[in-house]
């Protein structure tokens, strides 16, 4: 099998000439609004923190993930200021979300079966143990962050052949780190099946290449990338802390999941694919693993509000259709 590789110019790490606004003390209005948030939400409930740290195995020693030249691709300790209590200048709910999202490393989700890399990029990277290797779900945004996570798995769990890579959907933070897996797996890239939803490649090119310049510029504002990372600047993006600024690539799927969904057995692991197009992404798949009683929700369900309209200009999501997909998942796999 010959793998066709195409690299995208994703405008993730372009420099911008922005003048930082002077940091000022929060107004009385801001302070009162933030105080009201504290009163309206159950901040004494620490279950989120227990969930976010459960199964922690290890993380890297370095303060950041860098490329081959030593340039920072993704900062880790830069978010350490979030350890303190929320200041009057910050929305305490977003601050708490940042505290959760800054937790990073390798986690065991299901003993001996499912492992996850978190906090190395905006998305997570998941490893499913098959009979003779690994099935990888989503590969982060950059080669560097994905490789840091992959090496952590090899070091603390096991270095096994990669049997398949599954893209859940064509948002760049879920597929662009693919080269880290293909170039560093112990088996040949040609032996790795790449699975994605129907229409994945077309949707990835449409959003990230055709509209890449404009969307990249808007994303800079949306994520507050040029703001300093401190209590009066960037404290996170809600869904994750920030996006990586490294090497990106795109390898088309070798197999697409039909819109009707289907069931596959990959190296002994049964996977029931549920196609959910037109909701969180133009094309997307969720997965149920009957043998493990595990369900991968892709980005249809998060511990955030459902993102119906992104400020970067992605397609508007169909909220009604989205809700029906969640109902279907509960009915069929709950």
Model-found features: residue ranges?
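N-terminal pre-domain segments of enzymes
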Residues: 22-102, 326
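Conserved beta-strand hairpin/beta-sheet module of binuclear metal-dependent hydrolase folds
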Residues: 99-160, 285-289, 293-299
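Bacterial N-terminal signal peptides that target proteins for export
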Residues: 1-8
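Bacterial N-terminal signal peptides
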Residues: 9-16
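Active-site metal-binding motif and surrounding structural segment of the metallo-beta-lactamase
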Residues: 132-133, 143-195, 258
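Metallo-beta-lactamase
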Residues: 109, 134, 141-143, 195, 201-277, 321-326, ...
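Sec/Tat signal peptide C-region and signal peptidase I cleavage site
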Residues: 17-21
């Amino acid at each position: 099998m010959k793998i066709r590789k195409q690299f995208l110019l994703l405008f993730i790490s372009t420099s911008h000439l922005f003048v930082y606004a002077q940091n000022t003390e929060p107004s009385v209005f801001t302070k009162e609004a933030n105080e009201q948030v504290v009163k309206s939400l159950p901040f004494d409930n620490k279950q989120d923190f227990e969930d976010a740290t459960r199964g922690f195995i290890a993380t890297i020693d370095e303060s950041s993930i860098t490329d081959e030249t030593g340039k920072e691709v993704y900062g880790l300790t830069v978010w350490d200021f979030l350890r303190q209590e929320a200041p009057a200048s910050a929305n305490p709910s977003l601050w708490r979300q940042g505290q959760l999202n800054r937790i990073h490393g390798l986690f065991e989700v299901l003993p001996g079966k499912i492992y996850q890399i978190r906090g190395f990029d905006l998305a997570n990277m998941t490893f499913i143990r098959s009979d003779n290797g690994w099935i990888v779900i989503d590969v982060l945004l950059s080669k560097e962050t994905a490789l840091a996570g992959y090496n952590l798995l090899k070091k603390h769990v096991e270095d096994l052949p990669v049997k398949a890579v599954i893209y859940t959907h064509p948002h760049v933070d879920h597929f662009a780190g693919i080269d880290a897996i293909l170039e560093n797996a112990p088996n040949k890239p040609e032996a790795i099946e790449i699975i994605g939803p129907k229409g994945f490649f077309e949707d990835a090119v449409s959003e990230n290449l055709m509209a890449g310049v404009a969307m990249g510029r808007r994303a800079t504002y949306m994520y507050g990338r040029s703001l300093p990372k401190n209590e009066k600047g960037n404290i996170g993006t809600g869904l994750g802390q920030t996006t990586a600024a490294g090497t990106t690539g795109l390898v088309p799927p070798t197999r697409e999941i039909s819109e009707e969904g289907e069931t596959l057995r990959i190296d002994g692991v049964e996977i029931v694919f549920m196609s959910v197009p037109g909701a969180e992404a133009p094309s997307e798949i969720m997965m149920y693993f009957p043998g493990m009683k595990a369900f991968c929700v892709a980005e249809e369900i998060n511990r955030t509000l459902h993102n119906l309209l992104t400020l970067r200009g992605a397609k508007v999501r169909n909220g009604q259709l989205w809700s029906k997909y969640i109902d279907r998942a509960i009915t069929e796999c709950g």
